[in-house]
Amino acid sequence: MSAKLINGKEIAAQVRQQVAAGVEARKQKGLRAPGLAVVLVGHDPASQVYVGNKRKACEQAGILSLSYDLPEDTSQAALEALVDELNENPAVDGILVQLPLPSHLDADPILVKIRPDKDVDGFHPYNIGRLMQRKPTLRPCTPAGVITLLDSIGTPYKGQHAVIVGASNIVGRPMSMELLLKGATTTVCHRFTDNLEKFVGEADILVAAVGKPGIIKGEWVKPGATVIDVGINRMDDGKLCGDVDFDAAAERAAYITPVPGGVGPMTIATLLENTLYAANVLHADT
């Protein structure tokens, strides 16, 4: 392997230490700890693991973690009422509703109901609009975390061709806006893109966010490229792998993120950053 690994665990640990220092600085000034309300509906095993990790990270950083574990049969009205209650709670700086929700619930009205200044996931149309207008406040966690990874290796964005594979609302679309803000020339590939290999081969910065193991062949990667693999796919043998053929891509890339241990830890670290930002900037008077 010739590529240098971008160690998301180490970089995320640094971010979390910075957040913990920021929380401690608030306390030294006599201010309350930031508060994050995490709402889990049902008993999806993967969601329970994700939520547990987020709550643990909050506690380690000194952020107040407020847990709301609701039964599988929770109604739309009951969930919306809880969001309304959390919106008005001055101890809550951030509200996170863990997705996916059970099939009988509609996530869109829930996410829109979260107050934009408490939308620490960065999914609210207001916050996406701010990002589009080049005035971001609370940024979507995974794309913002990717930028932190790229910054850590001194990525020269201007003049670089960034190719994002995947056009989801959570990663692909806001990722394109983040890279545009940095000055990169940005291309988004999706399921209707012809000749994916061509675009991948032109990428100085490649971000793969599809959710299909090995969809990006290693031999497609441009020599010297930076490869960010957002995909997390569990194989039949229980192992995790990304969207990129890691071993082959690592022979051509200059930098590459592993799966696991690359982008995943940054998502939670950025969630903590957003929660502290909401407390310090958006709720400075509470």
UniProtKB/Swiss-Prot annotation:
Q: In which pathway does it act?
A: One-carbon metabolism; tetrahydrofolate interconversion
Q: Which UniProt keywords apply?
A: Amino-acid biosynthesis, Histidine biosynthesis, Hydrolase, Methionine biosynthesis, Multifunctional enzyme, NADP, One-carbon metabolism, Oxidoreductase, Purine biosynthesis
Q: How does it assemble?
A: Homodimer.
Q: Give one Pfam family, short name only.
A: THF_DHG_CYH_C
Q: Which gene encodes it?
A: folD
**Protein name, entry field:** Bifunctional protein FolD
User: Which EC number(s) does UniProt give?
Assistant: 1.5.1.5, 3.5.4.9
Concerning PROSITE patterns, the annotation shows: THF_DHG_CYH_2
Is Magnesium one of the keywords?
no
The UniProt family comment states: Belongs to the tetrahydrofolate dehydrogenase/cyclohydrolase family.
Its function, per the record, reads: Catalyzes the oxidation of 5,10-methylenetetrahydrofolate to 5,10-methenyltetrahydrofolate and then the hydrolysis of 5,10-methenyltetrahydrofolate to 10-formyltetrahydrofolate.
Molecular function via GO: methenyltetrahydrofolate cyclohydrolase activity; methylenetetrahydrofolate dehydrogenase (NADP+) activity
Q: Which GO terms describe its biological process?
A: L-histidine biosynthetic process; methionine biosynthetic process; purine nucleotide biosynthetic process; tetrahydrofolate interconversion
Domain of life, per lineage: Bacteria
